[in-house]
Design a protein with these regions (language model features):
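Conserved C-terminal alpha-helix-loop-beta "cap" of PLP-dependent enzymes
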Residues: 4, 290-320
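Residue-level signal for secondary-structure boundary elements
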Residues: 44-48, 91, 156, 247, ...
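Conserved PLP-dependent catalytic core of the aminotransferase class-I/II
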Residues: 60, 264-298
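A glycine-/small-polar-enriched, mobile loop at the entrance of the PLP active site in fold-type I
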Residues: 14-52
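Conserved PLP-enzyme active-site core in the AAT-like
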Residues: 2-27, 54-57, 62-66, 73-264, ...
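Charged, low-complexity, helix-prone segments enriched in Lys/Glu/Asp/Gln
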Residues: 39-40, 47, 91-94, 271-278
Length: 320
């Protein structure tokens, strides 16, 4: 059979994981494909295109400004870099050398997770230093405040990671984290790469939040950063320094605009019904087959996305 996989000598993939980078993230949506195909044939002023993206995307995110970068991971590094440099070009050119800069990033220990690469490394690529707080399983508000009090003059920003990778960690709740940072005049960066409810973080008064364009939105590979205008401008300036190696093409910028707009205009009720039909099909399948050594249950998304998963448990002492 001459399928895409056999023709290109690729291993066929049946995706039961979700939007994972390792398997190509997602199936690209039609609007993003059309947008990319249109702009491929034109020269454009990238600054102007990013300005248009900012206006159109920030309207949906309900925040002041936005920009497109190469990926959410790139956005993490650039956002941290901007908190150390501000709009000072001499500092931007100097990175990753952060001598004489406020270069510490406050983060709860359980948020130093690995999503395929380490959050720690994404932060340190900018030249910043990790200031972790809390214990192995828990972090408290008092621990955060104590850490801030002892290190305040060296803290450039604070990062909060929203991900199923660290959902079991007893972290300080995000609204309390942001409120505490505001009280101490520390800007907040939210790493929410795979989270659907994007505008939620700006309702909580986050200064910057980072999302993936090519996961649940199904756009081309890119990261979307939203937030307060002064911070977004400083992040964009990183393209004159370490951000140059993380630059994003015109096609990904244009596609992200249309991908996000399509996402917000989708029929959510229909989408949830379709997901539930698939879950019910597989539940019925396992109930009817009654496999020995296999159990299963539906697991709600741990960070609040509107999806459920069917988790399969295999007893390898019984089932081979």
């Amino acid at each position: 059979m001459n399928t895409f996989y056999t023709k290109n000598k690729l291993t066929p993939i049946i995706n039961v994981s979700g939007f994972m980078t390792k398997i190509g993230a997602s199936i690209t949506n039609s609007e993003s494909i059309k947008a990319a195909n249109k702009i491929f044939n034109y020269f454009v002023n990238i600054d102007e295109l990013q300005s248009i993206a900012s206006k159109r995307i920030s309207k949906y995110l309900k925040t002041e400004a936005a920009l497109i970068t190469a990926s959410a991971a790139a956005g993490l590094t650039e956002s941290v870099a901007s908190m150390m440099t501000g709009n000072d070009l001499s500092k931007i050119y100097k990175l990753p050398n952060t001598n004489k800069m406020k270069n510490k990033v406050l983060i709860q220990r359980g948020h130093l997770t690995n999503y395929g690469a380490e959050v720690r490394q994404g932060i340190e690529l900018s030249g910043a230093k990790i200031l972790s707080c809390g214990q192995k399983k828990i972090c408290t508000l008092k621990e955060l405040q104590d850490t801030i009090s002892k290190n305040k003059k060296n803290i450039s920003c604070a990062m909060y990671v929203v991900s199923h990778h660290c959902s079991d960690y007893n972290a300080v709740e995000i609204s309390k984290f942001i409120k505490l940072c505001k009280k101490n005049n520390i800007p907040t960066i939210i790493d929410a790469a795979s989270e659907e409810y994007m505008e939620h973080f700006f309702k909580l008064d986050a200064d910057v939040a980072i999302f993936s364009a090519h996961k649940f939105m199904g756009s081309l590979t890119a990261g979307i950063i939203g937030g307060k205008k002064k911070y977004i401008k400083n992040i964009y300036l990183q393209n004159l320094g370490i951000g140059r190696g993380m630059k994003v093409g015109k096609e990904a910028i244009f596609a992200a605009i249309f991908g996000l707009e399509k996402w917000y205009k989708r029929d959510l009720k229909k989408e949830i019904n379709n997901q539930n039909k698939i879950l019910k099909y597989w539940l019925k399948f396992f109930e009817n087959e009654n496999f020995n050594g296999i159990s299963y249950k539906i697991i709600p998304d741990p960070t609040g996305n509107k999806i459920n998963r069917l988790r399969i448990y295999i007893n390898n002492k019984i089932t081979k």
